[in-house]
Amino acid sequence: MNNLTGILDNKGTPLDKQKFTWKEMAGKPISKLDDDAFTRVRIILMNGIETDALRIKHGIARITGQLRGPLAEIRRVEQHQATMINWLISADHSPLETTVAYEQVAIEVTAAVAQTEPDPYQAQTYRFGLLEDFDHLYRYSAMLDRLEGKDANNILQGYTDIVPGRKTSEHHRHPDNDLRESYAKEEAALITKIHAAMITAAEFQTHDYYMNIGPLFADPLARQLYAEIASVEEQHVTQYGSLADPQESFMEKWLVHEAMEVYAYASCAEQETNPRIKAMWERFLDYELGHLQIACEHFKNIERRDPAEILGGPLPKMIEFKSQREFVRQVLAAEVNMRSSGTQYVDKSEEPQNSLDYRAHLNSEGIASNIVSAGYQWAPGGELMGMRKIS
């Protein structure tokens, strides 16, 4: 896929043909250990994208009356798409194991995006965020070992390192320092808009998952850890969401989101190794092409403009679903001490006082992310971990 403008000739599956049964929605899940980890990465990513598709369409429906019917019809299909995707996670994934998988998505997909993003500032923002999710993975891996005696690498399958990143205890910034500069809609490449919509969707899902699953733990440290990292995920949604131009009309945002869904499904279909799941990605790609066609028609009717104005321009290669280990290591070595001051990135020594004060109060009665990982160091070769105090 070099661009999306040619795709406008592909009508996809008509909306009235996009049908499901309960049985296929709650179908056979993947294997936790036998399927490739990137099959699960794609599943989690696409569930986040579909739930965000519901979210954005609900938002549009609340501010305009003429689209409520069409949006409701598309949302129903996307609800069923999200169900069929999300129900692929098997019941033998514990909530903590699923959490580890969510963080693998955040690391590997964000790292892939950071390397193909043409806007230097936006790419910097993705690198900044991935180092925080990288540390979240380390803290949750320690919790998985502590509570369940399990090796997180059973989920990660060796694709993603388990070492500290930028310390979670230092992620808690004043809200003023989580806002970012937006792309300019008239100047930004389509892929820049797609990236911002995609990563915002993925982080929103992670935030919601932690908010829902965190209170269900009996262990007080686990409850605190989920509370702490869920707060950081809200910061990430703020950060990535602010990358999009607020001057875009709701129709422009709808078009971008549909384009992002097409791009993401095409990426999944191209690289999926499980034939059954690949067929699902291909089916849903056709569904999204149908949704994109509907959005284009409403765009033409409401804004009296050609959708190619929004959907034109080249796209880089598909999202690369592969280990980004070397890139992440390079970013970790170069940028672990980076902080934010307003919308700009600065050295740790220049972090503004309002973030330091904000963090000091939050951390004043104990820091779960530090406690859970005290003495923890992941080591290969079994469920028993080597012990080394992490400062």
Q: Whereabouts are the PLM-identified features?
A:
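Non-heme di-metal
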Residues: 1-391
